[in-house]
Amino acid sequence: MTTELWIVRHGQTKFNVEDRVQGMANSDLTDKGIADARALGRGLAQDGITFDRAYASDLTRAADTARLALDAAGQEKLAITETVGLREENYGKYEGQLTNDFSQELFGLPNFTAALLAHQLTLAQIADATRAANEDRVPNRAEDNAMVQNRLDQTLRTIGQEALGEGDRRVLAVSHGTAILMWLNFIGFDTGGQEMLHNASVTGAVFDGAHFNVVDFDDLKWTK
């Protein structure tokens, strides 16, 4: 038996628009973020896709995305389990900072997005450098690459095992872009060097109790 994990990045937020570091820091969904979450739900419903259980990061932007999508899909009564395991990377003292200031301070690169797109930086390098730069904080809550990967992998495995144990066929899990990409690298999926996921995109994985088989990546077809 297998179960399907439909892993969704949250909708667009105010910090996304303002280009601010957004890990544990939270900002509300924009009007577009709300509309995209609802469009995702409607698109899934039109394709006859329903969920047996639903999970979301306990950060508001993810939990709100999950609720909006499920309500739009006609699954208003499906409860959402919020979990810290699906959270975004913790950036410590850099939370809420403009991404260009963050990139300049840590790497001497003035344009964060351009550096990512040009592959001057990887998500792993950013996370490892961020935790190292937070060593002056006690406790140091910033996460490096391995910490994020292990946390998300353990969480998704637990979710998958619970679904299999209950005979659930399909699970929604709303998380965050960087964390999802780090996890995909961890399980050996080739992201093609992609360092950003689209808001409200779907990444699908089939779980057999031991292994994940990624069958869809950064898919926006249900929001259109």
What residues fall within each predicted segment?
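Short beta-strand scaffold positions
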Residues: 56-57, 150, 174-175
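Active-site glycine-centered loops adjacent to acidic/histidine catalytic or metal-binding residues
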Residues: 10, 85, 176
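Short glycine/proline- and acidic residue-enriched helix-loop micro-motifs
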Residues: 110-147
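A mid-sequence, solvent-exposed acidic-amphipathic segment
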Residues: 134-166
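Acidic, low-complexity terminal tails and accessory targeting/binding regions
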Residues: 2-3, 89-101, 161-170, 181-224
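Active-site-proximal alpha-helix that buttresses catalytic centers in soluble enzyme cores
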Residues: 2-3, 8-76
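Phosphate-coordination/substrate-recognition cap region in phosphate-metabolizing enzymes
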Residues: 42-117
